[in-house]
Swiss-Prot record:
This is Histone-lysine N-methyltransferase EZ1. Residues 1-28, 369-425, 485-508, 867-895 are annotated as: Disordered. The gene is EZ1. It holds the Pfam family preSET_CXC. Disulfide bonds: none annotated. The keyword Transcription regulation applies. It is found in: Nucleus. Residues 383-399 have a biased composition (Polar residues).
């Protein structure tokens, strides 16, 4: 037993051989040896299994014995308690007394005391009844009872159970009326499952062999020692009751199983999850999430939809954070406050030392001091001329790079000594004093020295200058920054603070310090990237798309529990800021992730360049109601002269051409399509003013569409406080009146018995003309399925089918809302209208005239001339006309 387990563990620790790695054939001796090994292993497995079964049976026997003894103890205790209770068994005594009271009443009473009651009807008065009774003594009593006639009440109409739906649902695949429908045969008295097609008959599936644990050991041992050739498969078939193909498939499964176990032996579940990319982790969510309804497991559009990604992504940028508050203890804004205090103390220390210095560097220090005094002291950046001038040179380089213009020859020295690996972050909202620029223009040599200054403090602060913007970690003092850098000549020698402020070092020292600082920056960047997993990087990129360069929101919403705000800001500074300003040359230390993030940056820059290409301003396209789509086609559809076309989003990039799915189907591109907003086939909404969205002047209303707040300019959905960027609420309480279906602003509908037929729908509150009452919901079925169900509904003299578009029909028989009970009338007070709401066709019921409270709702089903049932035809129809009515599907049509 121990030897077999050790062998199994040794074989599982080794890398299993693939089936194609084994030899093509085996000699006779090898096959005989394999046969013997498998036979011995089979006996070991059988003996081990037998021992395990015996052990389990013994354990179950002991557990059953303990449980049975406990039940006996409980029963004995209950019996003792019942015997010791007062009054004996109350239940038995009560049953006996009841029997004597009701059954033995004659024996308890005397034979002459028995009373008999006789009911005798006499024709005294209509509606009266005489009751006579006699006792044992011979006395008789007569009582006259007057009957009360109950009024006749109509029978309650039959009611069918239905499921309430507040939104349309697509029919499930197994809900067809022709599949597995149960009929009861009165002749043979049995229920039969009848199907309209032979395809529904399930075919017998081949039984697959279920491998046991012992068979897995045999297969794994044979494949590890001898490969998986044809001869080995034939030998395995003698010990395993399976086909060679099944054994081969099982070997592949075992190989993957043990391979994953060997890989996961040194990794936790969290590490394995973080190593996956976001696409792999969200694979099931992508299939279940509906991007049109924004819900999971959508019943309307179904799962596994075609993913359509928009060609234009929302531009993102860095938000100003002067007025922001720290999001927590690990927020980069808190480190920014500490950084400001440290820099102010260091600046004061450098100023005090320069005033006492007698060296030739006093002039340079005085220049630095005078320039720092002219700068704004309220700014939260560095107050050093070296930092300002270096940043100024970077701003100049970035401007020349953006404009594709070569800088002047005189400025070449300014950018010559700037390290190319340093992040090219500009001081966007910082001001440079005019006095500093003038003084530096007169002394180019001094400016050159300042640029090439080897101050570790200046270089480290330059690397941290973006802390107010992105929160990079900075040392607490100048000494800590010096300690982090390696020494120049002596390993034990450190640079003093005075030397840093005076700037008295040689050119060799300058180059060495600059190289060391660059190496430190690169090492920090490599260290930052190495601690970010693939999933965390993908979440970071997704956060850049959603929230922009806001580390607080990214860390709080997408990287909660994984990364802090400080880590996100540091990662953004090391990877995102440098790539946004300069292209990556070759294979950088960022690898493929840097290329992916650079793609996001370039896509954003390209999108902005196209808009601001002419004269630096975005041109506003002027649209009128005539350019809102296809007015001619929509007008015919609105008048009911043409079928509505089902909308399916297209996946076109940029502009749509002739191959666009929307163009081929004759529909407009919507916001769910992948094409750009400037697509000529896109419906651009309306620009209506007050009270125009419910008139034919509105392009949305004219095209039988509801206004979309994402597309229409003046149609907003909010509380009106301006929190979403919309205009403030108007004083007259104006709201777009063409979004009733979208916002579900329906009226209260009551259900009651109708005076026409069956149940009816009633309005609770009075409504005015053209007011929205509610939505007619149900199952979305095909026209072929509607023909099948229509035949059954015609026999039941009911109609719940509603034509929606050329692809779907609404069926409210089993699923729907209360408006399904609204009856037909040739003179109705309501009308039905098909509206396109967020890309989906929906049926709305509107008031045709003013309707008072508690009135029943009627609308014209608009049956065809030969499809109306008898109860829906006009009164002047004769019996001959009724007999000639065809039994085709009776369907409702909206106007």
């Amino acid at each position: 037993m121990a030897s077999s387990s050790s062998k199994a563990s040794d074989s599982s620790s080794q890398r299993p051989k693939r089936p194609d790695q084994g030899p093509s054939g085996k000699d006779a001796a090898g096959l005989v040896a394999l046969h013997g090994k498998l036979a011995q292993l089979k006996r070991q497995v059988q003996s081990t299994r037998l021992a395990a079964i015996k052990e389990r049976v013994e354990a179950n026997r002991k557990a059953l014995q303990v449980h049975t003894c406990a039940l006996f103890d409980v029963a004995a205790a209950a019996e003792v308690a019942s015997r010791g209770a007062e009054g004996g068994n109350a239940l038995s005594r009560g049953a006996a007394e009841g029997h004597r009271r009701f059954v033995g009443w004659d024996s308890a009473s005397g034979p002459g005391e028995r009373e008999l009651v006789h009911v005798q009807e006499e024709n005294l008065v209509a509606g009266t009844l005489v009751l006579s009774s006699s006792g044992g003594s011979g006395a008789s009593h007569r009582t006259v009872v007057q009957l009360v006639k109950l009024p006749v009440v109509d029978k309650i109409p039959p009611y069918t159970t239905w499921i309430f739906l507040d939104k349309n649902q697509r029919m499930a695949d197994d809900q067809s009326v022709g599949r597995r429908r149960i009929y009861y045969d009165p002749i043979v008295n049995e229920a039969l499952i009848c199907s309209e097609s032979d395809d529904d008959v399930p075919e017998p599936e081949e039984e697959k062999h279920v491998f046991t644990e012992g068979e897995d050991q045999l297969i794994w041992k044979a494949t590890q020692d001898h490969g998986l050739s044809r001869e080995v498969l034939n030998v395995l078939c003698q010990f395993v009751d399976a086909t060679p193909s099944e054994i081969e498939e099982r070997s592949e499964v075992l190989f993957e199983k043990y391979e994953k176990q060997s890989q996961s032996s040194y990794k936790t579940d969290l590490q394995l999850f973080l190593d996956k990319t976001m696409d792999v982790a969200l694979d099931s969510f992508d299939n279940l999430f509906c991007r049109r309804c924004l819900v999971f497991d959508c019943r309307l559009h179904g799962c596994s939809q075609n993913l359509v990604f928009p060609s234009e992504k929302q531009p993102y940028g860095h938000e100003l954070d002067e007025n922001k508050r720290p999001c927590g203890d690990q927020c980069y804004l808190r480190r920014r406050e500490v950084y400001q205090d440290t820099c102010n103390d260091d600046r004061n220390a450098c100023t005090t030392y320069n005033m006492d210095s007698r060296s030739s560097s006093l002039k340079v220090s005085a220049t630095i001091l005078s320039e720092s005094e002219d700068s704004n002291r309220d700014e939260d950046n560095i107050k050093s001329t070296s930092i300002v001038e270096t940043s100024r040179s970077k701003i100049t380089n970035s401007e020349y790079a953006d404009k594709s213009v070569t800088p002047p020859p005189g400025d070449a020295s300014e950018t010559e000594n700037v390290s190319p690996d340093m992040p090219l972050r500009t001081l966007g909202r910082r001001k440079i004093s005019k006095h500093a620029s003038k003084s530096n223009d007169h002394s180019p040599d001094k400016r050159q020295k300042i640029y090439s200054s080897p101050f570790p403090f200046a270089m480290s602060v330059l690397n941290k200058q973006s802390v107010p913007e992105i929160g990079e970690t900075c040392p607490d003092s100048i000494e800590s920054a010096v300690d982090q850098l390696p020494s120049l000549d002596d390993p034990n020698k450190k640079i003093s603070t005075k030397d840093m402020c005076a700037g008295s070092t040689t050119n060799t020292t300058e180059n060495t310090l600059r190289d060391n600082n660059n190496n430190l920056f690169i090492s920090n960047k490599e260290h930052s990237i190495s601690h970010w997993s693939a999933l965390e990087r993908d979440l970071y990129l997704k956060g850049i798309e959603i929230f922009g360069k806001n580390s607080c929101l990214i860390a709080r919403n997408l990287l909660s529990g994984l990364k802090t705000c400080m880590e996100v800001a540091s990662y953004m500074y090391n990877n995102g800021a440098a790539m946004a300003k300069r292209p990556l040359s070759g294979k950088s230390i960022l690898g493929d992730f840097a290329e992916a993030e650079q793609g996001y940056m370039e896509q954003d820059l390209v999108a902005r360049t196209r808009i601001c290409r002419r004269k630096g301003r975005a041109r506003k396209l002027k649209y009128t109601w005539k350019s809102a789509g296809h007015p001619t086609v929509r007008k015919r559809i609105g008048d009911g002269k043409q079928w509505y076309t089902q909308y399916n989003p297209c996946g076109c990039q940029q502009m749509c051409g002739k191959d666009c799915a929307c163009v081929e189907n004759g529909t407009c591109c919507e916001k769910y399509c992948g094409c750009s907003k400037s697509c000529k086939n896109r419906f651009r909404g309306c620009h209506c003013a007050k009270s125009q969205c419910r008139s034919r002047q509105c392009p949305c209303f004219a095209a039988s569409r509801e206004c979309d707040p994402d597309v229409c300019r003046n149609c907003w959905v909010s509380c009106g406080d301006g929190s979403l960027g919309e205009p403030l609420a108007r004083g007259d309480g104006y709201q777009c009146g063409n979004m009733k279906l979208l916002l579900k602003q329906q009226q209260r509908i009551l259900l009651g018995k109708s005076d026409v037929a069956g149940w009816g729908a009633f309005i609770k509150n009075p409504v005015n003309r053209n007011d929205y009452l509610g939505e007619y919901t149900g199952e979305l079925i095909s026209h072929r399925e509607a023909d099948k169900r229509g035949k059954i509904y015609d026999r039941a003299n009911s109609s719940f089918l509603f034509d929606l578009n050329e692809q779907y029909v609404l069926d409210a028989y089993r699923k729907g809302d209360k408006l399904k009970f609204a009856n037909h009338s040739s003179n109705p007070n309501c009308y039905a209208k098909v509206m396109l709401v967020a890309g989906d066709h929906r049926v709305g019921i509107y008031a045709k005239d003013r309707i008072e409270a508690s009135e029943e709702l009627f609308y014209d089903y608009r049956y065809g001339p030969d499809q109306a049932p008898a109860w829906a035809r006009r009164p002047e129809g004769s019996k001959k006309d009724e007999a000639s009515v065809s039994h085709h599907r009776a369907h409702k049509v909206a106007r």
